[in-house]
Amino acid sequence: MPADDDDASYLLCAEDAGAAVFDVAVDISTCTTEDDECCSVGGEELYSAASIAELIGGEAEYSPRSDYPDRLRSRSIDPAARAESVSWILKVQEYNGFLPLTAYLAVNYMDRFLSLRHLPEGQGWAMQLLAVACLSLAAKMEETLVPSLLDLQVECSRYVFEPRTICRMEFLILTALNWRLRSVTPFTFIDFFACKHISNAMVQNANSDIQFLDHCPSSMAAAAVLCATGETPSLAFVNPELAVNWCIGLAEEGISSCYQLMQQLVIGNVQRSAAAAAAVNLFSDEGLSYDSSSPPPPKRRKRSPPGT
């Protein structure tokens, strides 16, 4: 922690410390955007195409200012300090078992704040305090169990801040971001983009095979998503064992069986269809084509039967 509270005097605000804590604890949970649909859901809600389009239209409101990346590249904002803060956030996320969305939101709050406000230069504790406060706010938004502000700093190596100091920083962040914490994130779109096209097509193809009648809809949906992610090398680690944790009630055996069947029948049929189409194109483009400028092949003379 900084040696003297005066070092953090820029964090002081007119409100009583208790009021600041109350604001953080109560108002964050009730704050809403102007449009209730513009919120992060972490994959728990389904959106229509119109809702997704509306979210895309409003996502810039939850992003840093447009000049922020250039300020990082030009080092007017220290990119190394930002990278260190992001690394710390990811370590604490893993240590506490937080959702990936929580870490993403913390970095989002930090970037948005840095694009709007200036931290004291040469004060390493200020950047770390910002990271702690942003992660605290993100955890309050998304996590069921939130560690105490002291426990949240278990991975901090240089400074440990008092709860009241963190709460003051939280209040500054909330003010700078206009209390807009329900950010639109990549997690908002993943379900829609991934399932709408690839997974839906797989379920549709599977519908024609009677072997899938042995499987419940939830297993088919999980298997379709697994097949879709299997086509992406970076997502090859996703498997039925992980899929069973997506929702209470899913059975690993059912998902695994349906997944194997879908790989054999649906993906196999698609590959065979593609191969057949390629073969047809090959014959039509090469085997059955000839140069119209060249003379036609000579006709064979019909041989007469002997004795004629």
Curated annotation (Swiss-Prot):
Alphabetized UniProt keyword annotations: Cell cycle, Cell division, Cyclin
The record's section on CDD domains has:
CYCLIN_AtCycD-like_rpt1, CYCLIN_AtCycD-like_rpt2
Transmembrane residue ranges? none
Any single GO CC term annotated in Swiss-Prot or TrEMBL for this entry: nucleus
Any Gene Ontology biological process: cell division
Q: Where is the signal peptide?
A: none
SMART domains given in the database record: CYCLIN (SM00385), Cyclin_C (SM01332)
Check the record and name the PROSITE patterns matching this protein: CYCLINS
Which intervals carry biased composition (Basic residues)?
298-308
Record's superkingdom? Eukaryota
The protein's GO terms of the molecular function aspect are: cyclin-dependent protein serine/threonine kinase regulator activity
Q: Where is this region: Disordered?
A: 286-308
For this protein, the record's Gene3D superfamilies field holds: Cyclin-like
Per the record, the similarity remark reads:
Belongs to the cyclin family. Cyclin D subfamily.
Give the protein's recorded name: Cyclin-D2-1
Organism of this sequence = Oryza sativa subsp. japonica
| Biological classification of the source | Eukaryota, Viridiplantae, Streptophyta, Embryophyta, Tracheophyta
